[in-house]
């Protein structure tokens, strides 16, 4: 176990590897870098290198280290092993007091385990999410259980996440309800107008075409891509006055599975991954969202966009309870039925669009840094975030 010398600033190492991690860590990184009580070091594993480059450029975040671990077709075990091996010498050299990771990715788990093995305090941002099913999502449910187990401080987005941890006999003094930092990021980037690189998207937004935004990338959904793709094609035929926009994930397995299924319809628009600010603008201008992304389940309700979840379960049950999201499943019939019901029923749509997001107030990063200050002995925690419908 490391002990900080009197007078030295605590050093916080922040590790991320995918764009969703970076989106949620960005406001925390910026808060830490602007706080004179801390030193910081930022490490990217490059798990999703192309999407991360777009994000880092948008937020002017320059990692101190980039492991560049992205390899086509590598196994989870290979990625995990390479991440731990790459992080360990950096940890030894930098000697951080705290290692912070976010969510449930292979990178997040590798950072937590590498730090735990070095006796360093672990902070888990977005702790406490659970489906109760290790196979869904896979491997994320197992990853987050392991990360929380070795964490000294768990920054949870909601009371439900806190309750999940308390049911696992977690010390309540190690839990802080912050709200979700994705709301901090979303509110910041949506303040200014954005011009799309893709003129087709710019045209859709300017013409006020009703947009159905579709994203699907989860590992457990790869075998369901034909069902999801077929559902999108049928919906596009029935709702011909809507534009179905699919920014395809950079993962070749996702692109290879989905692109051939949806490429023929005139009102289906397939794009490359979008820079985060452009994606946020597209989300803001969408009518509904179909997604298996956890982050988008949190982001869309901030703009009053109903979410249909392309999964059989979700760890973000707060969205279901608040009425801002519904489970559409992964079977064609279920997806078509769920989307059709929402698009054909104005009162049903209004009820979802007018519900209040349970995920935050834009101050989650401030609460997070205050909690880290408390953990390292240079400050005090702030009161927990409380959702008021």
What are these regions (language model features)?
Residues 1-246, 251-389:
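Nucleotide-activated sugar donor-binding and catalytic core shared by glycosyltransferases
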């Amino acid at each position: 176990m490391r002990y900080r010398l009197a007078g030295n600033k605590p050093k916080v190492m922040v590790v991320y590897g995918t764009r969703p991690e970076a989106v949620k860590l960005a406001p925390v990184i910026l808060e830490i870098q602007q706080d004179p009580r801390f030193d910081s070091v930022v490490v990217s594993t490059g798990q999703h290198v192309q999407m991360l480059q777009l994000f880092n450029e948008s937020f002017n975040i320059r990692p101190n280290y980039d492991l560049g671990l992205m390899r086509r077709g590598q196994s989870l075990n290979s990625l995990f092993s390479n991440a731990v091996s790459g992080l360990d010498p950096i940890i030894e050299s930098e000697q951080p007091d705290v290692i912070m990771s976010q969510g449930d990715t292979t990178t997040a788990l590798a950072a937590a385990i590498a730090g735990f093995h070095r006796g360093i305090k672990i902070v888990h941002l977005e702790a406490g999410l659970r489906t109760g099913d290790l196979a869904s999502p896979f491997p994320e449910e197992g990853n987050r259980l392991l990360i929380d187990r070795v964490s000294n401080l768990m920054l949870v987005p909601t009371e439900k996440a806190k309750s999940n941890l308390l049911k696992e006999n977690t010390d309540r003094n190690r839990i802080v309800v912050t709200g979700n930092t994705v709301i901090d990021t979303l509110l910041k980037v949506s303040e200014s107008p954005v011009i799309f690189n893709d003129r087709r998207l710019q045209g859709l937004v300017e013409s006020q075409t009703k947009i159905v935004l579709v994203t699907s990338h989860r590992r457990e959904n790869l075998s369901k891509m034909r069902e999801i793709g077929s559902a999108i094609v049928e919906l596009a035929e029935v709702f011909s006055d809507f534009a179905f926009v699919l920014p395809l994930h950079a993962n070749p397995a996702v692109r290879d599975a989905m692109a051939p299924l949806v490429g023929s319809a005139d009102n289906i628009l397939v794009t490359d991954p979008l820079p985060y600010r452009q994606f946020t603008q597209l989300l803001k201008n969408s009518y509904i969202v179909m997604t298996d992304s956890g982050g988008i389940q949190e982001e869309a309700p901030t703009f009053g966009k109903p979410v249909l979840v392309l999964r059989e379960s979700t760890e973000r049950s707060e969205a279901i309870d608040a009425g801002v999201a519904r489970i559409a499943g992964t079977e064609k019939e279920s997806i078509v039925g769920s989307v059709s019901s929402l698009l054909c029923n104005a009162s049903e749509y209004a009820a979802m669009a007018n519900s209040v997001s349970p995920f935050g107030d834009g101050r989650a990063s401030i609460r997070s840094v205050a909690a880290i200050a408390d953990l390292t002995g240079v400050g005090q925690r702030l009161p927990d975030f409380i959702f008021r419908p």
